[in-house]
Amino acid sequence: MSGSIRRSYTAMQNFPRFLLGVLFVATLSSCRPRLSEDEANWKGQTETSEVEEHLLLDPGNALRLFCDTNQSSSINWYREQERLLSGGKIRMVGTVLEVSDVTYEDSGLYICVVRGTGKILRRFSISVVDSLASGDEEEEEEDDDDEDGRREDTTADINEEPVYFFQAPYWTQPSRMDKKLHAVPAGNTVKFRCPAGGSPLPTIRWSLKNGREFRGEHRIGGIQIRHQHWSLVMESVVPSDRGNYTCVVENRVGSLTYTYFLDVLERSSHRPILQAGLPANTTARVGSDVEFYCKVYSDAQPHIQWLKHIEVNGSHFGPDDFPYVQVLKTADINPSDVEVLHLRNITMEDAGEYTCLAGNSIGLSHQSAWLTVLPNEDFLEQAEPAESRYMDIIIYTSGFLAVAMAIMIVILCRMQTPHSKQTLQTPTVHKLAKFPLIRQFSLESSSSGKSSAPLIRITRLSSSCAPMLPGVMEVELPLDAKWEFPRDRLVLGKPLGEGCFGQVVRAEGYGIEKDRPEKPVTVAVKMLKDNGTDKDLSDLISEMELMKVIGKHKNIINLLGVCTQEGPLFVIVEYASKGNLREFLRARRPPTPEDAFDITKVPEELLSFKDLVSCAYQVARGMEYLESKRCIHRDLAARNVLVAEDNVMKIADFGLARGVHDIDYYKKTSNGRLPVKWMAPEALFDRVYTHQSDIWSFGVLTWEIFTLGGSPYPVIPYEELFKLLREGHRMDKPSNCTHELYMLMRECWHAVPTQRPTFKQLEHLDRILTAVSEEYLDLSMPFEQYSPSCEDSASTCSSSDDSVFAPDPVPSSPCVFNYHNIHSQLGT
């Protein structure tokens, strides 16, 4: 009895475990898809003639499929031979399958099968068009049209030709693939397409001529593979992109291949070409409408302006021999809009010369036409009575004014006579305003740069203390023994140039080299003229002190000494015998074909690609040194880089430079004129200068080097330049510049300052320098197209804009020096 009770008790204890095991097995059975009986049955029917129904959906849409059946038995749903279960975004109610928020992965073959028998009731081929990436939003309109056509064609094919469960890939639009050879200019965007179909939906990949898969890292600039468009897109193609491109379309049944050949054509290195005879001379009457036409042909992006020649102060030309003009119409994004100039309801004032001016990164072209305006006869009849009526009034008024002016002249002459005599008896005095100039540099220096005492002691120097050169302002400065050079050991020679308020004189210095005191060394001496202001004097002294603090480097103009005692202020610097870099490059351009046999126009030396890379590398080294000294240059350009013997580059013109110690940026608050074509956007719009803004200027300088002294942004007015820079436009690649170097320029012109390289990184140009030979690039082609159609201003003032037409005479801006002798120019 007790044993029976014990067995019953044990059974009761094990019953919950038994029940839990049964439930667990049942749960697993219900969760696991039934792939045995019905799946085996319908898999045997995959080659039947049941017709698929095709549906094309956009991502995010809902898929709803009905399995029509009169049978009472339940059904199962499969996608690509995998059974579907309710859950997540899949919902099955009776014979209806619902899939919410479909994606590209939901594409494939859907079938409904009678549970137990495996009989296939319906087949659905679902294609979900993958969403466009953000970079695809700029798809051309014709591509969109092509895609619409593809969808329509696909639909037509589906209606006319049934597609079965398994089908090898096939071309859906073979007529669009007839063009196997694609020849495009460099810089264009290329698109290859291989639209295909098949069941299941095939995949596409692209391979190069060696058979390996083509990926984005295989090409500078990357690629875009658009699976939903069956396309390969490459932007800004270069000659190295030439070759075969093969698309491979495949699914589980088979595969297809198709090969395209890409040929990239070099762009034409030529300034814009204007159609002969346009614009044409026109004659019209007052009140009529006139149109001038100008047809422009240019491979590079042209910039077009319509100009009207005007008269200013009785002259049509300014002091620089440039005509005075008024800009009537400007366009650069859509040149066709500006190829026609419309003049409505013209008057007599509209008569004159009109010019169509077109420019690109290579150079400028222009053609002019005259408009003759004839008066209307009615207008003449009405004007004659008015003229006779007012003639008497004009005569009497003119006579009265002439007498009054004569009396005024006599009175003024009598008043000026005593004053003039008194002035002749008074000795001339050069006056200096009483202002203390405190040093602004806190860098470590053994010179007097640590002193905070005023640098200028106000004195009056009469004309009896005659300076060494006439018209030179004198000032007394404290003695700095480290830099002071004896004035009597300096023999001044001929002037090298003069600028806004100063001049530079070539000189021989005895004792510049300490170990050879009797050997003369050729130097350049800077000094003020008598029309220099207190601000000019302050700038020159500040520059002198900055050069003391910066120290010496091979690739900058170095300070050799100063003369501050017993005479005018002299700043002695190194002499660069080959002038500034811009004129150095222009003088060494290969001759044009028409000048090839003119010995006088053949340059003394030609530059190789290696020489040009060396120029950029040396400037980068000099700027890296200035950056290490916390100096922001602010006016880095080819005109401010000098060339010494052995083609050594020396950065000059510290007139705009600023030394900074506690912060690495400088914000300008004055409204002086600035070198806008070399300035970074943050410097243009926010007046904030950093080492990164100098990097932007270095990119423009590199562009100048590889165009052999070309003018950046030709013809573009400042207002238009601001807009283009904001929109992300940049200058084209020079024709004799490699893609690698152009990509370096583009990195220097990055809109985000922190994304630009540093000068330390730019010093890696030496890698390119050692990798190329002297004959790497042939520079024997004519470079005259890089010059503007007139000579650029030789001024080193920051206001130089390299325009071919001056809209108005502009006074020189206050810069340190502005040399007219540009061949032997020495900048500060």
UniProtKB/Swiss-Prot annotation:
Transmembrane feature ranges: 393-413
First-tier enzyme category under EC: transferase
Spans annotated as Disordered: 132-156
Composition-biased stretches (Acidic residues): 135-147
Its job: Tyrosine-protein kinase that acts as a cell-surface receptor for fibroblast growth factors and plays a role in the regulation of cell proliferation, differentiation and migration, and in regulation of lipid metabolism, bile acid biosynthesis, glucose uptake, vitamin D metabolism and phosphate homeostasis. Required for normal down-regulation of the expression of CYP7A1, the rate-limiting enzyme in bile acid synthesis, in response to FGF19. Phosphorylates PLCG1 and FRS2. Ligand binding leads to the activation of several signaling cascades.
Full protein name: Fibroblast growth factor receptor 4
Glycosylation sites: 70, 244, 281, 313, 345
Chain ranges on the Extracellular side, renumbered to this chain: 32-392
